[in-house]
């Protein structure tokens, strides 16, 4: 059985292949020179994904047990605020492209009619609202991949307005991934059974996240 710290290091090492494959998909997508119409579709999906993350993390804070460590609550609350910021920033990117104010409700409705695969959907699939370890694992893996993806997009996108916002979001996603690692390290310390449970979840998450990336970057309408 590994220490909590070494356990998290093991997961991070195992994430490298997923992260590189996701970055490669990003490079291929932007090399295709998608039109503004495609980019708006792309950012609509990203915006809704950030909103879903915001709702999920805020829900975790709202339903936290009174015995929850205050520092953990503070950090989780910061992540919820970051997700809200990302929601706003992607909305601004869409408005930058179209030159018009975005009807957010209409955008959500359009996304519901023609949904793009999203990492946030895994929060429900793995019942993260009821499983602290699943939530921490999601943060570590999915948010770590998001950092890699946003950084790659910041490099690929030529528009400086968009690129600068991508870089900001990437930095936040790295912080969120570290939060997951911090929480997971504490949760699995001294528990071989929980470590086995998390490893099984992480393997499935990696497969799901790669499939999401592959599906979405197979067409110009991509949320990577």
Regions found by a protein language model. Give the residues of each.
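Non-heme di-metal
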Residues: 1-224
């Amino acid at each position: 059985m590994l220490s909590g710290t070494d356990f998290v290091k093991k997961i991070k090492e195992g994430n490298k292949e997923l992260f590189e494959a996701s970055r490669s998909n990003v490079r291929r997508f932007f090399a295709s020179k998608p039109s503004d119409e495609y980019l708006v579709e792309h950012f609509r999906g990203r915006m809704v994904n950030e909103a879903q993350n915001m709702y999920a993390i805020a829900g975790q804070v709202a339903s936290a047990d009174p015995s929850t460590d205050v520092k953990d609550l503070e950090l989780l609350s910061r992540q919820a605020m970051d997700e809200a910021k990302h929601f706003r920033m992607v909305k601004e990117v869409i408005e930058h492209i179209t030159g018009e104010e975005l009807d957010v409700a209409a955008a959500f409705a359009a996304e519901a009619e023609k949904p793009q695969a999203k990492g946030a959907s895994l929060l429900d699939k793995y019942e993260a609202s009821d499983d602290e370890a699943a939530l921490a694992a999601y943060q570590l893996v999915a948010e770590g991949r998001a950092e890699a993806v946003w950084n790659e997009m910041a490099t690929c996108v030529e528009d400086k307005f968009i690129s600068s916002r991508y870089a900001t979001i990437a930095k936040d996603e790295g912080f969120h991934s570290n939060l997951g690692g911090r929480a997971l390290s504490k949760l699995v310390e001294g528990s071989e059974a929980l470590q086995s449970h998390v490893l099984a979840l992480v393997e499935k998450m990696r497969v799901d996240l790669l499939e999401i990336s592959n599906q979405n970057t197979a067409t110009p309408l991509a949320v990577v």
